[in-house]
């Protein structure tokens, strides 16, 4: 079996878990994300297509949505397939802990090698967290 490229990010947010959950799972409100030009929602919201500012389209299929706890989807485009898992939990002091794990399988072995240079998963995840904190009013 092919080995995925994997990246994990953990963040602690001052906002209530319900607020964080609603922001992350609401694909109709995406303007706060600097990495997305537009999102097209299809199949009654079970699927969506994200378009980057460069015009790259990635299709997502929501596979699990346990309110305030876990959000999962598979994803793919012409370059890769993969899956993403988001875990949400409330801390003792009322903050929200999020753990996002992304696993991608690059279709072409040569592109996989090059992807370490032009597709920095950790940087992409950190950009998302920074954008999320701004949306939540935490920065």
Regions found by a protein language model. Name each.
Residues 1-40:
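Hydrophobic ligand-binding cavity/cleft-lining segments
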Residues 1-6, 92, 134-139:
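Short, Lys/Arg-enriched, disordered terminal segments
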Residues 4, 32, 41-43, 55, ...:
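Short solvent-exposed loop/turn micro-motifs enriched in small/polar/acidic residues
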Residues 7-9, 35, 44-47, 58-59, ...:
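Residue-level marker for the onset of beta-strands and adjacent loop->beta junctions
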Residues 19-24, 29-30, 48, 62, ...:
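Hydrophobic pocket/interface hotspot
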Residues 39-60, 127-129:
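Short, structured interface segments that constitute the first stable element of a domain
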Residues 53-99, 103-107:
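Hydrophobic-ligand binding "helix-grip"
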Residues 104-139:
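A conserved amphipathic terminal alpha-helix motif
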């Amino acid at each position: 079996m092919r080995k995925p490229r994997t990246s994990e990010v953990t963040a602690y947010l001052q906002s209530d878990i319900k607020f964080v959950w609603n922001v992350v799972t609401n694909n109709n409100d995406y303007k706060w994300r600097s990495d997305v030009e537009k999102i097209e929602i299809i199949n009654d919201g079970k699927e969506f297509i994200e378009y980057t500012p460069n015009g790259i389209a990635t299709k997502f299929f929501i596979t699990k949505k346990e309110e305030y706890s876990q959000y999962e989807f598979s994803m793919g485009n012409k370059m890769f397939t993969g899956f993403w898992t988001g875990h949400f939990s409330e801390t003792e002091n009322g903050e929200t802990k999020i753990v996002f794990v992304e696993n991608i399988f690059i279709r072409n072995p040569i592109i996989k090698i090059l992807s370490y240079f032009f597709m920095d998963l950790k940087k992409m995840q950190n950009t998302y967290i920074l954008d999320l904190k701004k949306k939540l009013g935490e920065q």
